[in-house]
């Protein structure tokens, strides 16, 4: 055979190679290329919108923390934000991260699915909410669309209020008793001291210690329960004690760090609350109207600091919850059937199935189990004293600048995110 008999081989065209690939590979290649270019474009032109969007949300949240009703809206908004954080964290672990954006995945869950940045007023996904099918699977009529359109301007406002009210109600069911006992001990102790009731001198301190203990026991549970209620969107989930307690055990080390963070960032807030007691030296010559105006501006700035502090600890709490759920599933502490339906649905849609792994019994297992038990008990003791410090700063602040009722009945980072301590006589 000579070289003339060998047919000349031409290089394959790129289009021919593409056609030779399986259909699934072609679609995946094209999709990845589009998503890659889309993500680059999003990073280039959308970041100013994201920046200004967050500036608006933080400013609005700070202003709302100045009023009691506004603090309910802030609570609901942060709950919705935590819900989006947790779902986004699981989405990043799934294959859907390579196939589209987080917004696309949430849109596939329905018009009421979580969002990365909740709105304060307008309804999320307006077009989808307006054109969704009715309960019978039929296209909505014109009248129904008009009725739905009436809710668009204020739906998020109502949602924030409803979720916030439910969250605060559940929180006070556990923490309110300790707050009431501490308030009683403080008021009774001072009244008894003024009236020289020496026979009842121990009632105030002893009831105060009881109130502190009851509040601390509640606070060991409350932060994780708040996130669980926020993520599931179900107020009854707050009292899913068995599941929440296993989440705490699964991530106990970082949960202690979370408690320390809450206590740490509450210190500047306590200082800001107490500081006006020392303003008297340079406001003596001011009129009541001038003092009122100054305090309003001061507490507005404090409210902004409170809102940012609230975002910080709830961001960390959402991250802890996100990993804790997967950990309890991976260790077999909770079966998939025991999950809240909302969590189970999300994990199913994301194709996330942690396989339970059990440690083999033996000497190594016994040593590890014993060391973990000692370590866990140490963390519980540390957690107790961290929350004790959280309460102790309130007593110190009360001695320096007395605030009746609200100082003991409301801890802004955990209960009502409200920061307005203007004296009532000055307001009137």
Tell me what each language-model feature is:
Residues 273-304, 399-408:
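Extracellular/periplasmic helix-loop-helix junctions in multi-pass membrane proteins
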